Regions:
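Processing junctions and N-termini across compartments
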Residues: 25, 146-149
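Polytopic transmembrane helical bundles with strong interfacial aromatic enrichment
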Residues: 14, 32-36
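C-terminal motif of bacterial Sec signal peptides marking the signal peptidase cleavage site
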Residues: 27-30
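Short regulatory "switch" loops immediately downstream of catalytic or recognition motifs
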Residues: 1-2, 96
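Bacterial N-terminal signal peptides that target proteins for export
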Residues: 3-21
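Extracytoplasmic c-type cytochrome modules immediately beyond a signal peptide or single-pass transmembrane anchor
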Residues: 37-147, 164
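The canonical Cys-X-X-Cys-His
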Residues: 148-160
């Protein structure tokens, strides 16, 4: 009997650790990193800057969701509302840039309908996160945060070149 309890506790702990690791990986993946090997023109630079401008709020929310920082309802509400606004800006910079598109793959423009569907999925996930944040219900928030991160990953996997 104790082995079953230990096994269930171990499974629950492993599930929590996996979830925390996944959230951390998604957050880091969304942050970007060093200089890309792909050339960037001014539109691409603006797009990158707009994506990076979203990260302080997303990272702050992630720390609370993962339990790395105490959950502060008001701080989370504000971060989610700000993130909902700043998350719209990068998508105003997806014109092709003849000076270089950075890590954006040609599929962004050659499969514009699929890219638009990913953008819409992301916008819906962000709105769901903001709505959940305004309720203050942490379990709803965790699910919505995870969905938002998964939406980022889905788009990056299809439309962004890996870092070299």
């Amino acid at each position: 009997m104790n082995n079953k309890i230990l096994s269930q506790d171990t499974k629950a702990m492993n599930t929590k650790l996996f979830s925390a690791a996944l959230l951390a990986a998604l957050t880091l993946a969304a942050c970007g990193g060093g200089a890309p090997a792909q050339p960037k023109g001014p539109i691409s630079e603006d797009r990158t800057a707009a994506f990076k401008s979203m990260m302080p709020e997303f990272s702050s929310m992630g720390k609370m969701v993962k339990g790395e920082e105490p959950y502060d309802v008001e701080k989370f509400k504000q971060a989610a509302a700000t993130f909902a606004e700043t998350s719209k800006k990068p998508f105003t910079f997806f014109q092709s840039d003849d000076k270089g598109n950075g890590r954006a793959l040609p599929a962004v423009w050659s499969d514009a309908a699929k890219f638009k569907a990913e953008e819409d999925k992301f916008a819906a996930a962000v709105e769901k996160l903001n709505a959940a944040a305004q309720t203050g219900k942490l379990e709803e928030i965790k699910a919505a945060y995870s969905e938002t991160g998964a939406s980022c990953k889905s788009c990056h996997d299809t439309f962004r070149a890996p870092e070299e």
